[in-house]
Amino acid sequence: DTFCGIYLYMRRKKRYKHAIINKKKYYFYTIKWLDITGDAGHKNKDEMEKLPICKMITQAYVYKKTKKYLTTFSSYDQDDEVFSDTNIFPIGCVISMEKITL
């Protein structure tokens, strides 16, 4: 569109992937988080200093986020308020959350 020879650009609102369950909207995220790494073997000091931490990626719907926890699900019943593939993360382990666009 133009107005007096000037092009007008309308900014399009982003649309995000989501699920609607019992009239509530749940958004889909890519969540990056840190997980512990365990090893029951013996280690010297140098090996202890090099212990890695696991950097994990989860893709899921966010059920609830509080100051302490992030609760997610990946599957749900289309006819009832039933969730599967659930996780609860301590919020301190979460590095980032990116809402997925359509």
State what each model feature region is.
Residues 1-10:
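N-terminal amphipathic/basic-hydrophobic helices that include classical n-h-c signal peptides
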